[in-house]
Amino acid sequence: MAAELTSTRLNAENHLLLDQPLLRLPHELARRNFKSVQRLVEREKEYVLPALKETANASLSNEQTPDQALAALDAMISRMQGLKRKMENLHQEERKIQEQSRKRIQHLEKLHQIPSLADVQYDQWARVRLDRLMIDHMLRSGYIKSAQQLAREKGIEDLVDLNVFVQCQRIAESLRTGETKDALQWCGENKAALKKSQYNLEFELRLQQYIEMVRAGHKERFNDAMIHAKRYLAPYLETQSVEIHRAAGLLAFPPDTKAEPYKSMYAHERWAYLSDLFVRTHHELLSLSSRPLLHIALSAGLSALKTPSCHSAYTSSSSNSLSTTTSVCPICSTELNELARNMPYAHHTKSYVENDPIVLPNGRIYGQQRLLEMSKKVGCVEVGKVKDPTTGEVFNEGDMKKVYIM
């Protein structure tokens, strides 16, 4: 009884290991929102305070007419009103983030109130988490509208990161179509954070702009490309010297060159590379997992079930269609076979085998009694024959051989 209670007791801390991004992202968004407020206040303070002091001194010394002083004050008031509007927008954004965080914390707190895995409340909570993981997977796969619809139907908009992934997909798609404007704007908004990134996204975007200028192939664009390189590429000379020297070599090679590395630099596949690089950088800055959370959740279960035979040449789902239609092993299924390919095998300290094992001519081993019973249940097997439940092959009972385990 004690062992049974232990096996069904809910360990909330272990469950929450998978849900860390649920609170990490709102925290990161709140931090960035605060930094935006800080930058706005500092920028306006640097302008308004000196301007106010200068206007006051000029008025006292009669260097300005009353109309000039009023015009200067109007300009400062206009800037402060603009600051107020921006601050109000940021305040509304902060309230949204706080409300989102509150609902996410409430969702996680429910787990600590569930005593057992057998409790019906756990089934309800796990269903919500599965919906979250599905929406996360759809967002990362580009099925934005489907993800939004599912979130609305389930009423969990605040538990998923719709807006973040919508923006990410929009910018990634613009890069695939050959447009750098949105990505560069995003880099400008996150300039401070990008300095700590392991990726060099902004440099790669500026390099692509340079490549497109050189691709045009006429003198005026060459001049523009050199000016662009001095302004945007030269600051990276210490860290990206090899790429910058290669970029300079592009001036001597036409877009249809076969010489490497210039052929690869001119290749249109670079846009797909930039799109993937942006997604990796975006996820890194927002502390998002590079893999879908659904894959991470499945990994533990896949590893616990995986055996060496799951990816053998004979039973592989990619090479044996008959096997996939009859096998009940999740690892051998078409949907999960590739996902589990790089997972480690299950670590079993004990083996469980039938007490009457036999081997069929195709090398497969089964319990004799269970195999005979299954063959009878199938009904389409002749008397004195048995059917392999995995491959569907039929053999004579006399072809079965006893297996001895040493």
Swiss-Prot record:
Keywords, sorted A to Z: Cytoplasm, Metal-binding, Nucleus, Zinc, Zinc-finger
Zinc fingers, RING-Gid-type class: 329-391
Domain (LisH): residue spans on this chain: 126-158
InterPro entries linked to this entry: CRA_dom, CTLH/CRA, CTLH_C, Fyv10_fam, LisH, ZF_RING_GID
Limits of the CTLH domain: 164-221
Biological process terms in GO annotation: negative regulation of gluconeogenesis; proteasome-mediated ubiquitin-dependent protein catabolic process
Cellular location(s): Cytoplasm; Nucleus
GO cellular component: a single term: GID complex
PANTHER family, sorted: E3 UBIQUITIN-PROTEIN TRANSFERASE MAEA, MACROPHAGE ERYTHROBLAST ATTACHER-RELATED
Family label: Belongs to the FYV10 family.
Full protein name: Protein fyv10
Species the sequence originates in: Aspergillus niger (strain ATCC MYA-4892 / CBS 513.88 / FGSC A1513)
Record gene name: fyv10
